[in-house]
């Protein structure tokens, strides 16, 4: 199954986090062309602005007309948003070896098995919210296209899974204009000849559809309809390496947690392509809240990591009276140097 994590109205949401006075107000983040103060386009808008009719891609002059004296207009700060994106991508990368960053505010991961893994999706959502303040929506499906459509259905701040068993019926009832990659113009052209739903293509000659879409997009639609579409998640180079294990029962008993902590350490070091300068112990609590403690040093050898991790675990338990559901270790600031001497 493929999971898409989509950061809800990302640019505007970052602005809300950094200026709480914006919360509840229509917020519009725009790209200014520099020609004049009304020239440019809307990069994104929050849901309050969307309720006014201000949407992404709208010419700025039109958005200013709609939002006059009602909306807050801000210039895009992409480098600032990228810092938030990097933090979120690092969190997501811990949940799969196969991860594809689709854009600054979207990432796909390939999750093992054919079930929806709603628990993992909730965990990812909670970690991102707790560690960055950002709300995300998550879509899950058998391929990237279905995962993306599911994510759209999950917005705002939700989770939607189209299981393998539900895929056939879902595809049979999906509208052409809801399919990623087709676009408004081509959807309109297909609608005009009677193709409103994906299932309608079976009633038309393939060459007729090719005359509208071209060969590549026509093949894409047929593969999707016949449930034969596949596009692999393209992995990226990871910055962090971690392993998380679910405990047999929720507990605060260190003796019961330590064996799983050690397994997490061993697995994380096996994945890491070098020596970490930072180690974090991450505890997912019984209510799915996430608590973590970190240690940074010049070079953290595997033999030393267990004592460091135990100290971090003790800090978590002494400072929090909740039971722990899952325990994990995250290694970061990896040096690919071959020897410890290179650190000094």
Curated annotation (Swiss-Prot):
GO terms for cellular component: cytoplasm. Keywords: Cytoplasm, DNA damage, DNA repair, DNA replication, DNA-binding, DNA-directed DNA polymerase, Magnesium, Metal-binding, Mutator protein, Nucleotidyltransferase, Transferase. Mg(2+) binds at residues 6, 105. Its EC number is 2.7.7.7. GO terms for molecular function: damaged DNA binding; DNA-directed DNA polymerase activity; magnesium ion binding. The record marks 11 as: Substrate discrimination. It is found in: Cytoplasm. Pfam families: IMS, IMS_HHH. InterPro entries: DNA/RNA_pol_sf, DNA_pol_Y-fam_lit_finger_sf, DNA_polymerase-Y, DNApol_IV, PolY_HhH_motif, Rev_trsase/Diguanyl_cyclase, UmuC. One of its GO terms (biological process) is DNA-templated DNA replication. Its cofactor is Mg(2+). The active site is at residue 106. Signal peptide: none annotated. Residues 2-183 form the UmuC domain. It catalyses: DNA(n) + a 2'-deoxyribonucleoside 5'-triphosphate = DNA(n+1) + diphosphate. Binds 2 magnesium ions per subunit. Monomer. Belongs to the DNA polymerase type-Y family. PANTHER family: DNA POLYMERASE KAPPA, DNA REPAIR POLYMERASE UMUC / TRANSFERASE FAMILY MEMBER. Poorly processive, error-prone DNA polymerase involved in untargeted mutagenesis. Copies undamaged DNA at stalled replication forks, which arise in vivo from mismatched or misaligned primer ends. These misaligned primers can be extended by PolIV. Exhibits no 3'-5' exonuclease (proofreading) activity. May be involved in translesional synthesis. This is DNA polymerase IV. It comes from Picrophilus torridus (strain ATCC 700027 / DSM 9790 / JCM 10055 / NBRC 100828 / KAW 2/3). The gene is dbh.
């Amino acid at each position: 199954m493929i999971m898409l994590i989509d950061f809800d109205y990302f640019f505007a949401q970052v602005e809300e986090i950094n200026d709480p006075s914006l919360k509840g107000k229509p917020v519009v983040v725009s790209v200014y062309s520099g020609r004049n103060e009304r020239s440019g386009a809307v990069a994104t808008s929050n849901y309050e602005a969307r309720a006014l009719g201000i949407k992404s891609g709208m010419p700025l002059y039109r958005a200013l007309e709609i939002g006059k004296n009602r909306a807050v207009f801000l210039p895009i700060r992409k480098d600032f948003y990228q810092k938030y994106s990097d933090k979120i991508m690092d969190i997501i990368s811990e949940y799969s070896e196969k991860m594809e960053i689709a854009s600054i505010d979207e990432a796909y991961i390939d999750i093992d098995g054919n079930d929806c893994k709603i628990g993992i999706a909730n965990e990812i959502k909670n970690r991102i919210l707790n560690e960055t303040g950002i709300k995300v929506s998550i879509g899950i499906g058998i391929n990237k296209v279905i995962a993306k459509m599911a994510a759209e259905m999950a917005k705002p701040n939700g989770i939607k899974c189209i299981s393998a068993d539900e895929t056939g019926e879902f595809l049979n009832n999906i509208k052409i204009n809801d399919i990623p990659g087709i676009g408004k113009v081509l959807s309109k052209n297909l609608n005009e000849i009677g193709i409103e739903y994906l299932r309608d293509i079976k009633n038309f000659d393939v060459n007729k559809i090719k005359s509208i879409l071209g060969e590549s997009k026509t093949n894409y639609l047929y593969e999707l309809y016949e449930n034969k579409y596949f596009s692999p998640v393209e992995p990226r180079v990871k910055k962090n390496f971690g392993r998380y294990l679910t405990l047999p029962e929720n507990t605060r008993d260190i003796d019961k947690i330590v064996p799983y902590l050690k397994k997490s350490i061993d697995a994380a070091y096996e994945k890491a392509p070098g020596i970490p300068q930072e180690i974090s112990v991450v505890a997912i609590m019984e209510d799915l809240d996430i608590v973590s403690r970190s240690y940074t040093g010049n070079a953290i050898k595997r033999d030393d990591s267990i004592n460091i991790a135990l100290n971090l675990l003790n800090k978590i338990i002494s400072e929090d009276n909740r039971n722990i559901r899952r325990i994990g270790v995250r290694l970061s600031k990896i040096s690919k140097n071959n020897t410890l001497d290179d650190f000094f």
